[in-house]
Amino acid sequence: MAQVSYEEVNLMLRLYDMRREPRLRQARAWFVENFHPTSVEDMMEKYPQGSEENTYIRMVISYWDMVASIVNRGLINDELFFESNGEIWVVWDRMRTIVPIWRGAFKNPRLFANIEETYKRLEAWREKHAPGSSAAMRNMMAQIISKPKGA
């Protein structure tokens, strides 16, 4: 296990504290439970600009994009971060099919690249420490999504 600095631990705790902000916590809960876009059109139809759901999407994605930017710059030890921040993996897994369209629409090939990069590194770390766990998580999430609500 790599040595971590006081500053890294302090930053990690500050990021965790931000996650506890009531509105962001509500947005994160909604995102994990409800955000399953099949296309950008589907997303915009279900969650139009100005809707509370659209606000939640932007809050969650912008929070994790900021965090990923910090992680990718090496300001937090990867292992320290990956041990307790699997949610970023779920966020990217939910948005990855529509990101290429957003990148094209905004003519920005780097749009959400920080989340994508952290996701890839987290998945590699997870597979090293728990082989097959990413596939198992994807299968579990697919089952949850396919279940009718209230079932």
What are these regions (language model features)?
Residues M1-A151:
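Acidic, Ser/Pro/Thr-rich low-complexity regulatory regions
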